Curated annotation (Swiss-Prot):
Places the protein is found: Cytoplasm
SUPFAM superfamilies: DNA helicase RuvA subunit, C-terminal domain, Nucleic acid-binding proteins, RuvA domain 2-like
Organism: Wolbachia pipientis subsp. Culex pipiens (strain wPip)
Main location: cytoplasm
Protein's UniProt name: Holliday junction branch migration complex subunit RuvA
Length: 190
């Protein structure tokens, strides 16, 4: 089994890259977020998960820049009915932190991706709700002030993931704001 690969990106496609490691080109499937960080000629180190697809008689490599994203994939594929491709679609839409929040808050809308029905979304939430605490996500900086601001923006009709991203960006830039100021800045930004 391959733990990680370090090499130069030879080609970037819609859902994978070809990673040149010592003149051997590996096809590595990536989430859209990880894929956007790769450019031809760039040097990258990817954590790797290997999946042997017996139906198609192929072995596929899935790459991750962060350990958290890799752990999310491993949890998602343990849910009955979630394939590696489906898990990567979810991780293309949500960061590990957003996935964590969506499962804890039972946010079915945030988990909605193409090809994922309501039954499977419910199964993901049900099966992973108790397991998300095992995710080693740096969630410490997202404290109660942010949760209050997030709740306020959601109640005003904004989408959870967009509100979360906006609040996180505001807190990263200005960490000592109170809830009222975070909401005010978020409303100007969204």
């Amino acid at each position: 089994m391959i733990g990680n690969l370090r090499g130069i990106v030879d080609e970037v496609c819609s859902d994978h890259i070809i990673l040149n490691v010592n003149d051997v080109g590996y096809i590595v499937y990536l989430s859209a977020k990880t894929l956007s960080a790769c450019s031809i000629g760039s040097r990258v180190k990817l954590l790797i998960d290997t999946y042997a697809n017996s139906r198609e008689n192929v072995t596929q490599l899935y790459g991750f820049i962060s350990k958290e994203e890799q752990q999310c994939l491993r949890l998602l594929v343990k849910v009955s009915g979630v394939s590696y491709k489906t898990a990567m679609s979810i991780l293309s839409k949500l960061t590990p932190e957003q996935l964590f929040l969506a499962i804890i808050n039972e946010d079915k809308l945030a988990l909605k991706v193409s090809g994922l029905g309501l039954k499977l979304i419910n199964r993901i939430i049900t099966e992973l709700n108790g397991k998300v605490s095992k995710l080693e996500i740096n969630n410490n900086h997202f404290h109660s002030i942010s949760e209050d601001a997030l709740s306020a923006l959601i109640n005003l009709g904004y989408e959870r993931t967009k509100a979360y991203d906006t609040i996180k960006k505001i807190e990263d830039e200005s960490p000592n704001l109170d809830t009222k100021d975070i909401i005010r800045m978020a409303l100007k930004t969204i």
